[in-house]
Amino acid sequence: MGLGVISFDPLLYLLIAFSIIIAISILLFFLHVDHVFIWTFSLLSCMYIGGSAWESLIITIISGTGPLYLFLIWWVTYGIAAISFLVIDRVAQRRISKQIKWDRSIALGILILGLILLMGVMEDFGCFLIWGLEHFNPSEVTWHTWIGNTIPIFYLTAIPGGILTCIGLVLGRKFGKRNESLSEAK
């Protein structure tokens, strides 16, 4: 049984609606944000929507599944990913002073890189959970089947992503405490 015959689960509609409502709520809550925040969110959203459209097109060519169906499923996972980065950006703006120190921005970059690596794995794994592994076989969606069924690939991406995320968090806390103690000394 291929992806083209899977029925659209009503739970997916709820996930899509929930993802969009949360995104709009967060944007309304932070209406006073500065232009850097707006540009960051816009850029990330465009990246994720572009990625979802590209993957939808690729899988449509391979499996013959309608692009709208796949686009909506990808919007769920990528919409949640964009919300995650939105929250990370807000937390970073609140915790880091307006004069961002160079070492602190490196820590934030490492944190975001680790989260990007983890998000790719979680997004693919989430698709397997939604669709069910029984719908995948070697003749359909070869790339996704290979990623989902090859455990070493999961560890090669998830472990470095987790390590980079932890390093980013530790460095961020370390540099944050050092900057706070320097500002108190002045």
Enumerate the language-model features and the residues they cover.
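Aromatic-rich, lipid-facing transmembrane alpha helices and their immediate juxtamembrane interface loops
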Residues: 1-184
